[in-house]
């Protein structure tokens, strides 16, 4: 067994929502591929044609790193995924709050919604805040809006697209440095 230390999964934060990088692109592609597969679609485009939006719910933070969520939304757009939306359970940044995301999905005209955590571990936030039966869960709020024909939840962590935890770590770990190299 070994321990590897890697860069953050989403790479550098950057200064504003337009700063994206190869790490964000790789994560965006991986999570959308997996979400489509689980939902029975061949691609994000096929899901969009069927009227399905995917909402990826992250944690959120009041730290300046919260721009990462807007950067992920920018990355989804750059990939052409008009049916991918980024939200946060803590509602920070504000445009990622549940009610804001509901409005965006509704305004975009999608009638089917798939909620999925944008978290390494699918724990309490995924099971309760996203998929729970309480009226304040994301699922309940999307349903209560009356704007959607269906709201489904995929309670799977962002790391689930890797077969083992070691593959997840290795996928984002920097290659070992050569002797004499930092």
List where the protein language model places each region:
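Extended amphipathic ligand-handling, pore-lining, and cofactor/metal-binding catalytic surfaces
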Residues: 1-175, 180-182
């Amino acid at each position: 067994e070994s321990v590897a230390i890697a860069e953050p999964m989403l790479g550098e934060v950057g200064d504003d929502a337009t700063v994206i990088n190869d790490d964000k692109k790789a994560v965006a592609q991986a999570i959308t591929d997996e979400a489509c597969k689980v939902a029975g679609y061949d691609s994000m485009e096929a899901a969009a044609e069927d009227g399905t939006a995917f909402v990826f719910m992250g944690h959120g933070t009041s730290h300046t790193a919260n721009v990462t969520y807007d950067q992920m939304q920018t990355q989804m757009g750059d990939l052409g995924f008009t049916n991918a939306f980024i939200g946060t359970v803590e509602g920070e940044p504000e445009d990622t709050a549940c009610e804001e995301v509901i409005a965006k999905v509704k305004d975009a005209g999608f009638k089917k919604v798939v909620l999925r955590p944008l978290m390494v571990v699918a724990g309490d936030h995924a099971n309760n805040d996203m998929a729970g039966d309480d009226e304040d869960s994301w699922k309940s709020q999307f349903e209560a809006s009356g704007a959607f024909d269906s709201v489904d939840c995929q309670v799977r962590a962002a790391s689930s697209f890797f077969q083992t935890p070691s593959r997840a770590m290795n996928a984002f770990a920097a290659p070992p440095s050569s002797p004499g190299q930092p």
